[in-house]
Each structure stands twice: as structure tokens, then as C-alpha cells.
């Protein structure tokens, strides 16, 4: 019995640490896509929704330095359930309130209900409806600036939602760039 509890705790703790091998593979995939499709080759944004929502799981990846240059917590879609805090589900269906997986182009900047926001264009079948669904990058005042594990972050209606301070940092990176790739995976 004690062995099972210890094993569960070890698995639970380690599942909240980013898998760098996986991240490097996703970054390489993103870079290849950016080169082939004439997108920004300075950096991309990776979101690993396999991680606990209370840890950093949005990563700004520098293609030039081949490493993470910034990271912070990000919300996932709540769906129609009150129980999707740490086991996100994904959808491309309008009104599902779930996040979508896949590559997106970060599109135009605008001032929305939550301040500075960025529209997204889905580049894959799994996220082809993100613009129609109004899935965007935006801030929310209840999102933490830093990790809060083992607590959970608030959930969104499918949007890539970060804290106001982290949105300001993202905006500094994005506002003068074009065709930046956002890659959401699990």
C-alpha cells in the first residue's frame, strides 16, 4: 500500500516537469514548418497542455538560441464541465469552450474585452475553426504571473489566457513581428 502511494506521488510530481526532449522535438518541428511556410524564424510560442495548469507551460522558444527564453502559466479551455482543471480535453467545435491542439499563426493585435489581444488563424484540421470560435491570446487579471503548483490556474473558454504582466511581456515580443507560430500540443 505504501509503495503504491509513493509511486503515485513520484509520478504525479514528475508529470509537472517539462519534458525537454519532447519540447526540443516540437521546437524542431515548428522551425521546419516556419522555414517551409515563410513564417517568423526568430522564435515561436510552444504550449504544452500535458503539464499541470499550475506550472509554466507556455514557452517562448528562440530558434536563434535553440532554447526557451521566457515561460509562464497559461490557462486551458474549461469546456462545459467544472472538473477539467488538470485533465484538459480538446476540440475544434464552436461553443465547446475547449482549447484546440495544433499550429496557429498569431495574427492581428487588437484591444479587446481583456486588453491587448491577438487573433489566431488555425493551420491544421484540429484547429481550423479557432478564428470562427474567437479563440485568441489574451490576459486575465486572475491568472498568476508565476507557478502556483499544486494549485490550478483559472480556465478559459478555449483561449490562450495569461496574466496581465505576462501579456505585456508577450506583447513586447509580438507587436513588431509578423507570422509568429503558436504550437499547442499535449
Sequence positions of predicted segments:
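Bacterial Sec-dependent N-terminal signal peptides
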Residues: 1-18
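Charge-dense polyanion-binding interfaces
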Residues: 180-186
Amino acid at each position: 500500500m505504501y509503495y503504491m502511494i509513493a509511486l503515485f506521488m513520484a509520478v504525479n510530481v514528475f508529470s509537472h516537469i517539462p519534458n525537454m526532449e519532447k519540447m526540443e522535438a516540437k521546437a524542431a518541428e515548428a522551425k521546419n514548418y516556419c522555414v517551409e511556410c515563410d513564417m517568423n524564424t526568430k522564435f515561436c510560442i510552444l504550449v504544452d497542455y500535458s503539464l499541470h495548469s499550475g506550472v509554466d507551460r507556455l514557452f517562448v522558444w528562440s530558434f536563434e538560441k535553440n532554447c526557451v527564453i521566457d515561460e509562464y502559466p497559461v490557462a486551458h479551455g474549461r469546456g462545459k464541465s467544472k472538473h477539467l482543471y488538470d485533465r484538459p480535453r480538446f476540440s475544434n467545435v464552436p461553443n465547446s469552450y475547449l482549447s484546440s491542439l495544433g499550429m496557429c499563426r498569431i495574427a492581428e493585435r487588437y484591444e479587446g474585452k481583456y486588453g491587448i489581444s491577438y487573433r489566431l488563424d488555425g493551420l491544421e484540421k484540429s484547429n481550423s475553426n479557432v478564428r470562427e470560435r474567437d479563440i485568441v491570446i489574451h490576459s486575465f487579471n486572475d491568472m498568476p504571473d508565476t507557478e502556483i503548483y499544486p494549485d490550478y490556474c483559472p480556465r478559459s473558454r478555449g483561449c490562450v489566457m495569461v496574466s496581465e504582466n505576462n501579456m505585456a511581456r508577450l506583447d513586447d515580443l509580438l507587436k513588431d513581428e509578423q507570422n509568429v507560430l503558436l504550437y499547442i500540443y499535449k
